[in-house]
Amino acid sequence: MKGFSTTIEINSNPNTIWEILTESSNYHDWNKSVEKIEGNIAVGEKIKVYAKISPDRAFPVKVKEFVPSSKMVWCGGMPFGLFQGVRTFTLTERNNGQVEFRMQEEFSGLMSPLIVRSMPDLTESFELFASSLKAKAESVA
């Protein structure tokens, strides 16, 4: 199974970070890896993510899990389990007043070996997402 992940420490609080992560209309203002998000980021909702690496292509996902200020899971892919991407965002409050932000995406399904072989390396995009979130959260903290 192929996947990508990034982790960063943010000098802010989980509620501030969560507000930034879940306000879809403002992604273009702070996120250097996401062009825009269409839709409402809430459990059960379908949203469309437009990444800067492919700004003309929408990635439709469904918000599967939504635990305020803690965890969010987006899922998207092909029907019948042929291919699925699961992106998980977690916020963990540390004793030192920082919050650990982790974002990971894992791919699975029967078509996964073929599809992931042609995918670009998303490591840089994930790190840019995390550093953009850190900069925004620390500027409003």
Model-derived features: positions:
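Alpha-helix N-cap/helix-start motif
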Residues: 20, 30, 56-59, 84, ...
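Hydrophobic pocket/interface hotspot
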Residues: 16-21, 27, 47-49, 63, ...
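Short beta-strand micro-motifs in enzyme catalytic cores
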Residues: 2, 45-47, 87, 99
